[in-house]
Amino acid sequence: MMTLTTDKKTMNITEIQSLLPHRYPFLLIDRVTDYEEGKYLIGLKNVSVNEPQFTGHFPQLPVFPGVLILEAMAQATGLLAFKTFGAPKENELYYFASIDEAKFRKPVTPGDQLMVEVEFLKERRGIALFNGVAKVDGDVVCSAQLKCARREF
């Protein structure tokens, strides 16, 4: 799958917020632990019981919603797109375009640390294709193929 570099490039929350428009409670990447432009990005999401989705999903047995795992993958692809293709023009954004072959293998619960790994596959006419895998303690909890598109708004 991914070949990791020995010299790690990272991003803290300040740099992530400078690239993504999302904010709490919808900013789902807390830190980037490694990336290489045009190749891969590894992001981290600390799952806390204090997050608002746990009041209703599910009060007796809190489970991090699968759709939010996919959103974390989409945000990671956006970060990798910025690092690979540069910042969009003032009237452009990277949009989440599609998801295919999403599979959920294990539940994610409060206290888990979600590692989101995305790999750039190809780009054509402003649409980029990525593979995504989310892991907890090294075990795959979700995988999918994602596309993001650079478009004017």
From Swiss-Prot:
Tell me where it mainly resides. cytoplasm
Active site positions, chain numbering: H57
Which compartments is it annotated to reside in?
Cytoplasm
Would you tell me the Gene Ontology cellular component terms?
Answer: cytoplasm; membrane
In terms of Pfam families, this protein maps to: FabA (PF07977)
The family database entries (InterPro entries) matched by this protein are listed as:
FabA_FabZ (IPR013114), FabZ (IPR010084), HotDog_dom_sf (IPR029069)
Q: What class of enzyme is it?
A: lyase
Spell out the disulfide connections: none
Query: What keywords are assigned to this protein?
Result: Cytoplasm, Lipid A biosynthesis, Lipid biosynthesis, Lipid metabolism, Lyase
Which Gene Ontology molecular-function terms are recorded? Answer: (3R)-hydroxyacyl-[acyl-carrier-protein] dehydratase activity
Q: Kindly list the biological process annotations in GO that this record carries.
A: fatty acid biosynthetic process; lipid A biosynthetic process
Lineage, top-rank taxon, reads Bacteria
Task: State the family named in the UniProt similarity comment for this chain.
Answer: Belongs to the thioester dehydratase family. FabZ subfamily.
NCBIfam families associated with the record: fabZ (TIGR01750), PRK00006.1 (NF000582)
What does the protein in this record do? Involved in unsaturated fatty acids biosynthesis. Catalyzes the dehydration of short chain beta-hydroxyacyl-ACPs and long chain saturated and unsaturated beta-hydroxyacyl-ACPs.
What is this protein's name? 3-hydroxyacyl-[acyl-carrier-protein] dehydratase FabZ
The record lists the lineage as: Bacteria, Pseudomonadati, Pseudomonadota, Gammaproteobacteria, Vibrionales
